[in-house]
Curated annotation (Swiss-Prot):
Pfam families hit by this protein: DUF5884
Record family assignment: Belongs to the mimivirus L885/R898 family.
InterPro entries documented for this protein: DUF5884
Protein name (Swiss-Prot/TrEMBL): Uncharacterized protein R898
Protein backbone atom coordinates (compact mmCIF):
# COMPACT_ATOMS: atom_id res chain seq x y z
CA UNK A 1 0.00 0.00 0.00
CA UNK A 2 2.80 2.44 0.90
CA UNK A 3 4.44 1.77 -2.47
CA UNK A 4 1.17 2.62 -4.26
CA UNK A 5 0.81 5.86 -2.30
CA UNK A 6 4.41 6.81 -3.07
CA UNK A 7 3.92 6.01 -6.78
CA UNK A 8 0.71 8.06 -6.93
CA UNK A 9 2.38 11.02 -5.20
CA UNK A 10 5.37 10.81 -7.53
CA UNK A 11 3.11 10.79 -10.60
CA UNK A 12 1.15 13.79 -9.32
CA UNK A 13 4.35 15.75 -8.70
CA UNK A 14 5.65 14.87 -12.17
CA UNK A 15 2.37 16.08 -13.66
CA UNK A 16 2.59 19.36 -11.74
CA UNK A 17 6.20 19.92 -12.79
CA UNK A 18 5.33 19.26 -16.43
CA UNK A 19 2.56 21.87 -16.25
CA UNK A 20 4.90 24.39 -14.60
CA UNK A 21 7.30 24.15 -17.54
CA UNK A 22 4.53 25.49 -19.81
CA UNK A 23 3.70 28.56 -17.70
CA UNK A 24 4.65 32.18 -18.29
CA UNK A 25 5.98 34.63 -15.66
CA UNK A 26 2.55 35.88 -14.59
CA UNK A 27 1.29 32.35 -13.99
CA UNK A 28 4.46 31.44 -12.10
CA UNK A 29 4.06 34.47 -9.82
CA UNK A 30 0.50 33.41 -9.02
CA UNK A 31 1.64 29.88 -8.23
CA UNK A 32 4.48 31.19 -6.07
CA UNK A 33 1.98 33.23 -4.04
CA UNK A 34 -0.20 30.13 -3.57
CA UNK A 35 2.80 28.04 -2.50
CA UNK A 36 3.96 30.66 0.02
CA UNK A 37 0.44 30.91 1.42
CA UNK A 38 0.20 27.12 1.77
CA UNK A 39 3.63 26.96 3.45
CA UNK A 40 2.56 29.67 5.88
CA UNK A 41 -0.65 27.82 6.77
CA UNK A 42 1.20 24.54 7.30
CA UNK A 43 3.74 26.30 9.53
CA UNK A 44 1.04 28.06 11.52
CA UNK A 45 -1.32 25.11 11.99
CA UNK A 46 0.77 23.77 14.87
CA UNK A 47 0.56 27.19 16.56
CA UNK A 48 -3.25 27.17 16.82
CA UNK A 49 -4.81 26.05 20.12
CA UNK A 50 -7.26 23.21 19.57
CA UNK A 51 -10.29 25.22 20.74
CA UNK A 52 -9.99 27.42 17.63
CA UNK A 53 -9.23 24.75 15.02
CA UNK A 54 -12.84 24.21 13.93
CA UNK A 55 -13.70 27.92 14.16
CA UNK A 56 -11.21 29.20 11.57
CA UNK A 57 -12.42 29.75 8.01
CA UNK A 58 -9.37 31.27 6.34
CA UNK A 59 -5.86 32.56 7.03
CA UNK A 60 -4.14 35.04 4.76
CA UNK A 61 -0.56 36.24 4.95
CA UNK A 62 1.13 38.70 2.60
CA UNK A 63 4.62 40.16 2.62
CA UNK A 64 5.86 42.88 0.26
CA UNK A 65 9.19 41.00 0.32
CA UNK A 66 7.58 38.48 -2.07
CA UNK A 67 7.01 41.20 -4.68
CA UNK A 68 9.32 40.54 -7.66
CA UNK A 69 10.14 44.28 -7.86
CA UNK A 70 11.02 44.55 -4.16
CA UNK A 71 14.24 46.35 -3.19
CA UNK A 72 15.75 46.40 0.28
CA UNK A 73 15.37 50.20 0.49
CA UNK A 74 11.58 49.72 0.26
CA UNK A 75 11.41 48.12 3.69
CA UNK A 76 8.96 45.28 4.26
CA UNK A 77 5.24 45.36 4.99
CA UNK A 78 3.52 42.26 6.35
CA UNK A 79 -0.22 41.67 6.65
CA UNK A 80 -2.02 38.83 8.37
CA UNK A 81 -5.73 38.10 8.65
CA UNK A 82 -7.49 35.15 10.26
CA UNK A 83 -11.22 34.85 9.61
CA UNK A 84 -13.53 32.91 11.93
CA UNK A 85 -17.17 31.91 11.97
CA UNK A 86 -19.81 34.51 12.92
CA UNK A 87 -18.16 37.38 11.04
CA UNK A 88 -15.13 37.58 13.33
CA UNK A 89 -11.48 38.09 12.44
CA UNK A 90 -8.05 39.01 13.76
CA UNK A 91 -5.71 41.14 11.70
CA UNK A 92 -2.23 42.53 12.09
CA UNK A 93 -0.11 44.90 10.00
CA UNK A 94 3.64 45.34 10.53
CA UNK A 95 6.32 47.46 8.86
CA UNK A 96 10.07 46.95 8.97
CA UNK A 97 13.11 48.84 7.75
CA UNK A 98 15.66 46.63 6.01
CA UNK A 99 19.42 46.85 5.68
CA UNK A 100 22.40 44.65 4.91
CA UNK A 101 24.83 43.69 7.65
CA UNK A 102 27.81 41.61 6.54
CA UNK A 103 25.93 40.39 3.49
CA UNK A 104 22.83 39.31 5.46
CA UNK A 105 19.52 41.11 5.15
CA UNK A 106 18.44 42.43 8.56
CA UNK A 107 15.12 43.81 9.78
CA UNK A 108 14.13 46.41 12.36
CA UNK A 109 10.62 47.29 13.53
CA UNK A 110 9.69 50.77 12.35
CA UNK A 111 7.62 51.33 15.49
CA UNK A 112 7.76 49.17 18.62
CA UNK A 113 4.33 50.42 19.69
CA UNK A 114 2.03 48.29 17.60
CA UNK A 115 -1.45 46.83 17.79
CA UNK A 116 -3.45 43.82 16.71
CA UNK A 117 -7.14 44.15 15.84
CA UNK A 118 -9.98 41.84 16.80
CA UNK A 119 -13.01 42.41 14.59
CA UNK A 120 -16.47 41.24 15.63
CA UNK A 121 -19.11 42.19 13.10
CA UNK A 122 -18.73 45.92 12.46
CA UNK A 123 -16.82 46.57 15.70
CA UNK A 124 -13.04 46.56 16.06
CA UNK A 125 -11.20 46.06 19.36
CA UNK A 126 -7.50 46.80 19.64
CA UNK A 127 -4.74 45.17 21.69
CA UNK A 128 -1.61 47.31 21.95
CA UNK A 129 1.78 45.74 22.54
CA UNK A 130 5.46 46.62 22.61
CA UNK A 131 7.30 44.76 19.85
CA UNK A 132 10.46 44.74 21.99
CA UNK A 133 8.77 43.38 25.09
CA UNK A 134 5.82 41.28 23.98
CA UNK A 135 7.52 37.96 24.65
CA UNK A 136 7.36 38.32 28.41
CA UNK A 137 4.16 40.23 29.15
CA UNK A 138 1.02 40.33 27.02
CA UNK A 139 -1.94 42.45 28.11
CA UNK A 140 -5.36 41.29 26.93
CA UNK A 141 -8.35 43.48 27.75
CA UNK A 142 -11.95 42.40 28.21
CA UNK A 143 -12.84 43.56 24.70
CA UNK A 144 -10.51 40.91 23.29
CA UNK A 145 -12.33 38.26 25.31
CA UNK A 146 -15.51 39.11 23.38
CA UNK A 147 -14.07 36.98 20.60
CA UNK A 148 -14.59 33.92 22.81
CA UNK A 149 -18.22 34.91 23.34
CA UNK A 150 -18.78 35.38 19.62
CA UNK A 151 -17.29 31.96 18.88
CA UNK A 152 -19.35 30.30 21.65
CA UNK A 153 -16.21 29.39 23.61
CA UNK A 154 -16.40 29.38 27.40
CA UNK A 155 -14.32 32.11 29.05
CA UNK A 156 -12.49 29.75 31.39
CA UNK A 157 -8.96 30.58 32.52
CA UNK A 158 -7.61 27.89 30.21
CA UNK A 159 -9.50 29.24 27.19
CA UNK A 160 -8.38 32.79 27.97
CA UNK A 161 -4.80 31.56 27.87
CA UNK A 162 -5.51 29.81 24.58
CA UNK A 163 -6.70 33.13 23.15
CA UNK A 164 -3.53 34.73 24.48
CA UNK A 165 -1.42 32.04 22.82
CA UNK A 166 -3.22 32.48 19.50
CA UNK A 167 -2.68 36.25 19.53
CA UNK A 168 0.91 35.87 20.70
CA UNK A 169 1.68 33.39 17.92
CA UNK A 170 0.05 35.61 15.29
CA UNK A 171 2.39 38.41 16.38
CA UNK A 172 5.35 36.01 16.41
CA UNK A 173 4.80 34.56 12.96
CA UNK A 174 3.70 37.69 11.07
CA UNK A 175 7.22 38.56 10.07
CA UNK A 176 9.22 38.66 6.84
CA UNK A 177 10.43 35.29 5.57
CA UNK A 178 12.77 33.61 8.10
CA UNK A 179 12.62 36.61 10.47
CA UNK A 180 10.03 34.96 12.72
CA UNK A 181 12.50 32.14 13.41
CA UNK A 182 14.29 34.45 15.84
CA UNK A 183 11.06 34.78 17.84
CA UNK A 184 9.73 32.03 20.05
CA UNK A 185 6.40 30.56 19.00
CA UNK A 186 4.37 29.50 22.01
CA UNK A 187 3.67 25.80 22.32
CA UNK A 188 -0.02 25.08 22.62
CA UNK A 189 0.82 22.46 25.25
CA UNK A 190 2.91 24.67 27.52
CA UNK A 191 1.96 28.30 28.07
CA UNK A 192 3.54 28.90 31.48
CA UNK A 193 6.53 30.83 30.08
CA UNK A 194 4.61 34.05 29.49
CA UNK A 195 2.48 36.28 31.70
CA UNK A 196 -0.94 37.02 30.24
CA UNK A 197 -2.62 39.94 31.97
CA UNK A 198 -6.39 40.26 31.61
CA UNK A 199 -7.63 43.72 32.48
CA UNK A 200 -10.75 45.84 31.85
CA UNK A 201 -10.60 48.10 28.84
Amino acid sequence: MNELIYFDRKKRLESILNHIKKLDYDDLRQIKKAILQQEFELDFNSCIPIIFETKIKTMKYKSSHDNPNWEYSDGIKCKFKMEFDNDCSIDLYCEYTTYYDGGDLEYTDIDNNRSININIGQKTYTIDFDADNYQTIFVINNDALKLLDSLSIDKSDSNKKCLGILIYNIVGITKPEDYHESFDIMSCDNFDDIVFIYEPY
